[in-house]
């Protein structure tokens, strides 16, 4: 208290006030400010002042032997005085000019390799086309964008390890190169940069540009891929835009684009399967994008999109804490709420159970073509300020906000029943029911909302129920603004959980994402997406399912054959046969399955009736739950090419055609690969040749484990016994001979012994 009184007393004297406000500060403080610390306080002044001196540069002593004292014009290039405090020479800027013109030439072979990002940029600009300049108001919103075209997607730590390994291989320090991409890049760069004379620091800096994604939070009105961002200063100002088409694409943009397409396809497909989460993981792990495993890309790529984030959540990765509704990203900026279940009645007197958010909250809403600020109380929209590219985009944002508000007049505006279903034919949750309903037709919603007189506010304008702008009236609480709303800038990621049905929740239990939020937009991927999972075979239609199913059987024939004879039920239940079922007419699936299973059982029972091509051809039909009936079929129908096509049980058809001489299988006229029939089909006694070096001991003996295929026999040690599957699907017990001398006689005895063992 005493101190404060003293200060007040001092301040009351006018002289004190004058001293503190008018006089210059003690000079020592200023000197300190500009001399303490290594950081240059006024770099441009320092530069101008230095360059005004005669010899502002210092160089190594060796320079005096390589650069003459004077140039052709007689100007002095370096001083005989040495630099104070070091053993370097003082040099004039003219020496640099001389060096650039007359200095030694080094090999330039490494320049395009080290400065690759710059050379590539020049190429893109050279081939790019600049269109006309348009003058108009630019609605820019800040988005997190990639500013560095042509980079790989390594984390800073991974890149650091690669750079150290490439540039300073002998430096001490633990470096762990684990990921596929790290190893590939390291190998590639080491080869490229052999005998490179460019300074290691420069090489390291340029490598970093090539390996790491750099993002900035920038105001953007147009394209956000990195090849547009690198020319942002040329394409959009405050009141103008210049049309531009990039002169080349870069892999990082292609990866981002293809990743989104793959993720959307996978989430859509997983949502309709019996166990969506397991299916999604299986597909993510077996998919490649441009030759890189999708899971590796997901771990490194920061793209935020609904489907991509669902895949990341499934893999246990952190994602952004914002949530998605109606294709917009919502981020709460203030307020809080508690959730409570409430039953409401629609205009059609249908009861809906909705989770009401009680409390005042503010959100930003960011979509592809519109953005908004929304303020809401319990089941009431207080204010919505929206901006967008066009009337349509603004309307979409308004509908989403109105549904999100959960207002009663919105629920009462429902006409007709709400019974929207998702791809798996399950009813959507009430909020998405409402959203779908009004996205189809929002006329009643807008009419019933109510309108109000508005004040004239700079940059804001009203909007009427028919979406026409107005300066006098507007739909209640809703205004259109010229200014966009910035995207949420934080890169913070949170731990989330995901349930079986792919609903992603934060740790408080709020739903952030669900499959309903995944866009239905179809696009063509820039990079090849290879879905190895059988679940994705149907993405290219029924023909692809047919070809892929048969190719899978042929590729795995050795194991399929063993399962066919020993554990058929397990084989019939394989998920690879699931897509095929959609091609078989529903009414007859069960009968086909029963018929084929019976046929296969006869093949197992009756010697000499094993038929490779027939098993392969009919196997997919046996996967459906069988119906027992006495029906026999000579052909089976599959729905491809828009109609039913027949597969003949015995013999070839346009759908399934096997050429015995060429051993090629064609499905619907497309080559499906080589099919090697079992040796004994048609020619007896050949299996003996296969079994040379083995002694046949008799019938199958279960104590020696499951039957091996003939290929697997080579792994047996001498004297070891094993069951083996021979041609007809029969299993015999064999022993690998202890001596090689007797191999010749095996061929003759084998044939007899097989006959005996089987009979």
From Swiss-Prot:
CC terms in the record's Gene Ontology section: host cell mitochondrion; host cell nucleus; virion component
Top-level taxonomy: Viruses, Riboviria, Orthornavirae, Negarnaviricota, Polyploviricotina
Pfam families for this protein: Flu_PB2_1st (PF20947), Flu_PB2_2nd (PF20948), Flu_PB2_3rd (PF20949), Flu_PB2_4th (PF20950), Flu_PB2_5th (PF00604), Flu_PB2_6th (PF20951), Flu_PB2_7th (PF20952)
Motif Nuclear localization signal, residue numbers: 736-739
Organism expressing this protein natively: Influenza A virus (strain A/Qu/7/1970 H3N2)
Gene it is expressed from: PB2
Protein name in the entry: Polymerase basic protein 2
Quaternary structure annotation from Swiss-Prot or TrEMBL: Influenza RNA polymerase is composed of three subunits: PB1, PB2 and PA. Interacts (via N-terminus) with PB1 (via C-terminus). Interacts with nucleoprotein NP (via N-terminus). Interacts (via N-terminus) with host MAVS (via N-terminus); this interaction inhibits host innate immune response.
Record's subcellular location: Virion; Host nucleus; Host mitochondrion
Span of the signal peptide: none
């Amino acid at each position: 208290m005493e101190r404060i009184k003293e200060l007040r007393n001092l301040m009351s004297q006018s002289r004190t006030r004058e001293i503190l406000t008018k006089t210059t500060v003690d000079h020592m403080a200023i000197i300190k400010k500009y001399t303490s610390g290594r950081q240059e306080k006024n770099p441009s002044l320092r530069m101008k002042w230095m360059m005004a001196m005669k010899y502002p540069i210092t160089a190594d002593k060796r320079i005096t032997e390589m650069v003459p004292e004077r140039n052709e014009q007689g100007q002095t290039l370096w001083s005989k005085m040495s630099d104070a405090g070091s053993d370097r020479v003082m040099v004039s800027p003219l020496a640099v000019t001389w060096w650039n013109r007359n200095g030694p030439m080094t090999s330039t072979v490494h320049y395009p390799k080290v400065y690759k990002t710059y050379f590539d940029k020049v190429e893109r600009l050279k081939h790019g086309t600049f269109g006309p300049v348009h003058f108009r108001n630019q609605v820019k919103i800040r988005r997190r964008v990639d500013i560095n075209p042509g980079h790989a997607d390594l984390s800073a730590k991974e890149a650091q390890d690669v750079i150290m390994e490439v540039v300073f291989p002998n430096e001490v320090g633990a470096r762990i190169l684990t990921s596929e991409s790290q190893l590939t890049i390291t190998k590639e760069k080491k080869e490229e940069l052999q005998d490179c004379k460019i300074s290691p620091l420069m090489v390291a800096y340029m490598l970093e540009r090539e390996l790491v994604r750099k993002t900035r939070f920038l105001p953007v009105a147009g394209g956000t891929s990195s090849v547009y961002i690198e020319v942002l200063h040329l394409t959009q100002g405050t009141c103008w835009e210049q049309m531009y088409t990039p002169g080349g694409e870069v892999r990082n943009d292609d990866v981002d684009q293809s990743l989104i397409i793959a993720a959307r396809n996978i989430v859509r497909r997983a949502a309709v399967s019996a166990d969506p989460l397991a299916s999604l993981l299986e597909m993510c792990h077996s998919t490649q994008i441009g030759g890189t495993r999708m899971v590796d890309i997901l771990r490194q790529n920061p793209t935020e999109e609904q489907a991509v984030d669902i895949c990341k959540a499934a893999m246990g990765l952190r994602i952004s804490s914002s949530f998605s509704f109606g294709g917009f990203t919502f981020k709460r900026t203030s307020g809080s709420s508690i959730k409570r279940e409430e039953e409401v009645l629609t205009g059609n007197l249908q009861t809906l159970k909705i989770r009401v958010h009680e409390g005042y909250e503010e959100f930003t809403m960011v979509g592809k073509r519109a953005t908004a600020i929304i303020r809401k109380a319990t089941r009431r929209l207080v204010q919505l300020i929206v901006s967008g590219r066009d009337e349509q985009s603004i309307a979409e944002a308004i509908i989403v906000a109105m549904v999100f508000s959960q207002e009663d007049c919105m629920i009462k505006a429902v006409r007709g029943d709400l019974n929207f279903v998702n791809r798996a034919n399950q009813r959507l949750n009430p909020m998405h029911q409402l959203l779908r309903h009004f996205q189809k037709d929002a006329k009643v919603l807008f009419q019933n909302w109510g309108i109000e007189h508005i004040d004239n506010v700079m940059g804001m304008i009203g909007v009427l129920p028919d979406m026409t702008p107005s300066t006098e009236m507007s739909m209640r609480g809703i205004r259109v603004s010229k200014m966009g709303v910035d995207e949420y800038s934080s890169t913070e990621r949170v731990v989330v959980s995901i349930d079986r049905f792919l609903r992603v929740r934060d740790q408080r239990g709020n739903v952030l994402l669900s499959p309903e939020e995944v866009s239905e937009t179809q696009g063509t991927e820039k990079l090849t997406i290879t879905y190895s999972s059988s679940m994705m075979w149907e993405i290219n239609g029924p023909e692809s399912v047919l070809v892929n199913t048969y190719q899978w059987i042929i590729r795995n024939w050795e194991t399929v054959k063993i399962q066919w004879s020993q554990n058929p039920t397990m084989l019939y239940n394989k998920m690879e046969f699931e897509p095929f079922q959609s091609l078989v007419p529903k009414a007859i699936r069960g009968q086909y399955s029963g018929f084929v299973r019976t046929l296969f059982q006869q093949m197992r029972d009756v010697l000499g009736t094993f038929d490779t091509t027939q098993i392969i051809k009919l196997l997919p039909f046996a996967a459906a739950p069988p119906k027992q009936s006495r029906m026999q079929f000579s052909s089976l129908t599959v729905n491809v090419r828009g109609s039913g096509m027949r597969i003949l049980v015995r013999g070839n058809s346009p759908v399934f055609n096997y050429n015995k001489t060429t051993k090629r299988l064609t499905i619907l006229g497309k080559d499906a690969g080589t099919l090697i029939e079992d040796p004994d089909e048609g020619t007896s006694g050949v299996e003996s040749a296969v079994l040379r070096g083995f002694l046949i001991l008799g019938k199958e003996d279960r104590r020696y484990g499951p039957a091996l295929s003939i290929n697997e026999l080579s792994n047996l040690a001498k004297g070891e016994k094993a069951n083996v599957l021979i041609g007809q699907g029969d299993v015999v017990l064999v022993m690998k001979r202890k001596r090689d001398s007797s191999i010749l006689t095996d061929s003759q005895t084998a044939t007899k012994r097989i006959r005996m063992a089987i009979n």
